[in-house]
Amino acid sequence: MKNAIVIGAGIVGLATARALAAKGFAVTVIERNELAVGASIRNFGMVWPIGQPTGKLLERAMRSRSIWQELCLAANIWHEEAGSLLAVHHRSEMQVIEEFVAQNKNDRHCEILLPKEAIEKSPALRNENLLGALWSNTELIVDPREAIAQLPLFLKEKWGIKFLFNQGVSHVETSKVLVGKKVFEADLIYVCSGQEFETLFPELYAEQPITKCKLQMLRTAAQPNGWRMGAALSAGLTLTHYGAFKDCASLSALKKRYEAEMPEYVKWGIHVMASQQGTGEVTLGDSHEYGLVFDPFDKDYINHLILDYLDGYTHFPTRHIAQTWNGTYAKMKNGATELVLHPSNDITIINGLGGAGMTLSFGLAEEVVSSV
């Protein structure tokens, strides 16, 4: 049996380990922390096919969704087939979603709902100024903190994948991985190190059109009395953030309106989404700052912008904020949706999925290992 080493136990590493094990490899995952604590646990937990462009990326997202569902059912990980609503409050936003639905009538299960219909799918939506909403039934929600912690246990049980936590890889070369003075050998090595560019192959990363993105997020206290928000929510600003909408001719006018009327939201890359976890908390965000180094301090101003926009289209039984945090992920600067490099025949780097790691990783990993 051939063996493989995967470096990193975030979502990209876990997806790669699963894909390799499914092909018959003996797999060892090496993670520098006692559990993954990076971008993979600092997100909404949204598997979000509606945001991916029609074609290869949508197919990849739907394959990932299928794998997520399979794993969650088998491993008893909480998940919800919540679907999603993108609420619109201005004619310019409505034009974009009308165009989107017309373009995708043969490729997606989506439709425009009247305000009353949208509120039936999510009681969190405000009726004031609501023109309608783009409904999609494909979105799936997990709690990333729970899922990323539980998946290693299941992958070990089902496929015998070995996990070595608290083991920092310092060097990789052909067929060898160094952890301190220990040497691990493998037929294939996959480096899935997320926003950590500085330790493994830093010179190679320096040649790539890749950067980092810092985002700020929040989470409410658990909603009282078992209240559920239903569909995952977003609103007009989200139309400017996801590639699925880029071919809508009316998007250009919408962007210009936001630049004129909401310049601070454009400056900080803010669009506002909400998803509810199984324990009742609602995860909110986010902003987008780009660069290779960030100050470690969150900006209260950004959090207030997020909450102000949220309050304009939602209401929750409690909006008490229990937690705030930031996350950082790798992002391509050239429009690419991932970075796959081969420093040598037996070493592969998988990175640069931007903010779509939860949505695309399982599908991408299968594609990457399909030829081995």
Set out the residue ranges of the language-model regions.
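Beta1/beta-strand and adjacent pyrophosphate-binding region of the FAD-binding site
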Residues: 1-12, 28
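Glycine-rich FAD pyrophosphate-binding loop
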Residues: 22-41
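Dinucleotide-binding Rossmann-like beta1-alpha1 core, especially the glycine-rich loop
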Residues: 44-121, 130
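Short beta-strand to alpha-helix junction loop
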Residues: 59-60, 87-96, 134-153, 296-302, ...
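Helical element adjacent to the flavin cofactor pocket in flavoenzyme catalytic cores
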Residues: 133-175, 184-188, 192
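Central helical "cap/lid" subdomain
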Residues: 183-250, 316
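Conserved FAD/dinucleotide-binding core of flavoprotein oxidoreductases
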Residues: 211-214, 221, 230, 235-311
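C-terminal catalytic lobe of FAD-dependent flavoproteins
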Residues: 269, 277-283, 289-372
